[in-house]
Amino acid sequence: MSFRFQIEATDGLARAGRFFTPHGEVETPVFMPVGTVGTVKGVPQDTLEELGVQILLNNTYHLYLRPGVETVRELGGVQKFMAWDRPILTDSGGFQVFSLSDLRKVTEEGVSFRSHLDGSLHFFSPESAIAAEIGLGADIIMAFDECTEYPAERARAQASMEMTLRWAKRSKEYFEAHKEEVPWFREVRDSPFALRSSPDERLGEQSASVGKQKQVPRGLTSARDDNPDLMAHDGTAEAVPFQSNSEHPGSGEERMANGEQREGQTQAIFGIVQGGTYLDLRRESAERTVELDFPGYAIGGLSVGEPREMTYEMVNAAIPHLPVEKPRYLMGVGTPEEIVQYVARGVDMMDCVLPTRAARHGLLFTSEGRVTIKNARYAKDEGPLDPRCNCKVCQRYSRAYLRHLYSSNELLAQVLNTIHNLAYYLDTMRRVRQAIKAGEFATFLSGVRPPHLSVL
């Protein structure tokens, strides 16, 4: 078995559980920081580990262009390349390709596009996109899909949905035929899988500590990250050696000793639900994608400019038609308040550039509301950014100092701001998981303040 998902508690539609991958287990609901080109901007991997990041998202389009799939494959896969031994998810590059607009041409076979780096011509088909994802070697990969713009006429949204369904079938067929080509396949298959201690156990330990102080894959043919707009609500890799970070009974070491089945011998591919902003198309897309029997399902094509309430409606339309026993991934969302709302609707996985992008523009998320750190009111503020936050930024630095760094265009401002925003998102999800397991999620949800009431 390559991928397994289990639900451990429910509260309403919200679920708490975990899934198992070749590079470790992930507790859900989970927020995945975006490391587009193999890095979360400004934050080294050891800091991400200290923050309790369980899984990262990398972008196939960007890594395909630079440094190239062949390079990453020869260096052992994306985990080994970026010195990160925890799980990674790659998107297929579809969203980035389709956002190029004037630089692309779509046919049934695939998409021709020009690189945003040098204008060179490239081609992605479902087969070549999956070949790239296999070559990169992430734990979870996405089927190749077509994203529609907003707004889109119904005929356009329906045609795109049909295309995505055909491409999903081709993506899965190619993956099934080539899944053993993942760079680390044989090492993981032949080695004990690292069943680590609970991510939340690791995070608790880390928080306490912080508080105290070879070939281009077949089918792949080759012929700017970071829009400052904040409107988003938006190969052989080393097998991970067995280690337990907890002496807690039932830890990974004990489960392995008891003979629990090893997981994660190759990648898992998720299908993507499309359908624009049409409820019936979203339902149809969900039902027909499920017929293809993926191990997990994503809801894509949202947070592209539509009103927030419309996003909620589209999620509500799709979720009931996705299998209860498989993870649900909502792509490209959202604010801290929104991700909690999506959990309430039954979503298990989310990613968004917002915490890192907003940090670089001086917008910080706190338990007291959003802080625009450049504001003059913070010039002599000796208090911490967030009195309730245990991240190393809030434990050490004042608002006045953070404002000084940002106003001086110091690189450290971006680093510290990003660390805090990620800590806030990750802590939010940790508290969500705890609330679901305690049967107190409704109470937790009622205490989440609306975004428009939380600006300082």
What are these regions (language model features)?
Residues 149-153, 158, 296-303, 411-414:
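Glycine- and acidic
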Residues 1-18, 26-30, 42, 145-151, ...:
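C-terminal extensions of enzymes
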Residues 115, 265, 441:
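Long C-terminal interaction/binding lobes of large macromolecular proteins
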